[in-house]
Every structure is written in C-alpha cells, then in structure tokens.
Amino acid sequence: MDIVDLVRIEKAYDRYGRKFLERIMTGEEIELCLKKPSPLASIAGRFAAKEAVVKALGTGITAAVHWKSFEVLNDPAGKPFVRSSQPGLLPEGCSIKISIAHDRHSAVATALLCRGPES
C-alpha cells in the first residue's frame, strides 16, 4: 500500500515537467495520464501503485527493479492492472492485483501479490 500527496507530485511536475514523468513511467503510461480530466491525480495514482507493487514484491526500487520494469495500465473497463516488461519480475505462478483511488488531496494504491492463475 502507498499514499501520495498530490501537492508533492504537482511540485515535481512543475519543476521538471515531462522529464519527471519519463523517469517514472513509460510512454504509454504518460499518455494515459495526460488524457485524463485530472492528469495530476492519475500521475499520483500510478506513482502510488508502482510504490505499492515494489513493496508487495519486497524489493523496493533498485537497480534490478526500476520504475519502468512494469507498467500500470487500464483494461477497457478502466480496471488498473500491472504489465511487466521485465522477465522474472514476478515469482513464478504469481500475479499482482492493484487498486487505485484518489481525491483532491491524495492518491492511494494497494497491491497484492497473489499465488495462482490470474482471475
């Protein structure tokens, strides 16, 4: 689980612009966020989700598991999911389930590392 203050994300984005986004997200993630009615809330939500995922994996952000090792995307119904671009990121037979929420002040995300097939 992770919670992010939207003001923190806003300050980083105001200071570094797209460079900030390119450091923590893939191009597809960036485009998804910038298309949203509240781009900062979407950016904060994905940031929180990425933090929650690395906590669930027990690794944190490292040289081996970095911001772009996986993407936080949405299925056609809008449900968030994790797509790994790094072979072996997840333990064999495991999947990750995520949930993201936000309000005017913060974004929160939860990630669960699940054994067994994806559902």
UniProtKB/Swiss-Prot annotation:
It catalyses: apo-[ACP] + CoA = holo-[ACP] + adenosine 3',5'-bisphosphate + H(+). InterPro entries: 4-PPantetheinyl_Trfase_dom (IPR008278), 4-PPantetheinyl_Trfase_dom_sf (IPR037143), ACPS (IPR002582), Ppantetheine-prot_Trfase_dom (IPR004568). It comes from the Bacteria. Mg(2+) binds at residues 2, 51. One of its GO terms (biological process) is fatty acid biosynthetic process. Keywords: Cytoplasm, Fatty acid biosynthesis, Fatty acid metabolism, Lipid biosynthesis, Lipid metabolism, Magnesium, Metal-binding, Transferase. Pfam families: ACPS. Its EC number is 2.7.8.7. Its cofactor is Mg(2+). It is found in: Cytoplasm. The keyword Heme does not apply. One of its GO terms (molecular function) is magnesium ion binding. Transfers the 4'-phosphopantetheine moiety from coenzyme A to a Ser of acyl-carrier-protein. Belongs to the P-Pant transferase superfamily. AcpS family. This is Holo-[acyl-carrier-protein] synthase. It comes from Chlorobium luteolum (strain DSM 273 / BCRC 81028 / 2530) (Pelodictyon luteolum).
